Amino acid sequence: MSKYLLVDIGAGTMDVLYYDDADRQHYKAVVASPVIQVANQIAADSGDLLVTGVEMGGGPVTRILKERAKTASVIVSVSAAATLNHDLQKIASWGIDVVPDQDAEKLKSDGGCTHVCLADLDPQRLANIVKGFGVPFSFDVFGICAQDHGVPPRGVSHLDYRHSCFVKMLDNKPFPHTLLYEKNAVPEEMNRLRAIAR
């Protein structure tokens, strides 16, 4: 008998499914995706901004940070910068300063900027969603799905790179579960999934 929590982190929504196979009890919730929540958090404030955290899905966050950089100082830690682009020079060309993680931590403690932390997984938010189901936050299986393009070599598109990674794995073992990774076995090039697994 097992209790499962499955989370699909998408561009617009985060889908959460709880299932207990002992009594076939299941609950689901569809909420705003983390990237939408973070973009809204950034939009709700004005002025200088410090962004730390890890790589996450980035479309709306990237757009709003590029806009903010036109009117205020935007400083992003190297670890969080991968959300925007893997090319740090490109990020700098948008007027966004990229700094080492240690420098970002010092700036955070100085308190001179509004601070936003990037992450696809907010454990407290997830715990609150599950609390709404009326079940304990304790599972035998916890699965998370997120689209990770990987870190392609220079000159290769993210889409082509991701597809080549998938083809390589599926050619070797042509089953959908080939694309499932244990927490400690996420491939090196999958930064976003590795950040979620931590």
Predicted regions and their residues:
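Nucleotide/phosphate-binding catalytic cleft detector across ATP-hydrolyzing
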Residues: 1-5, 9-11, 17-198
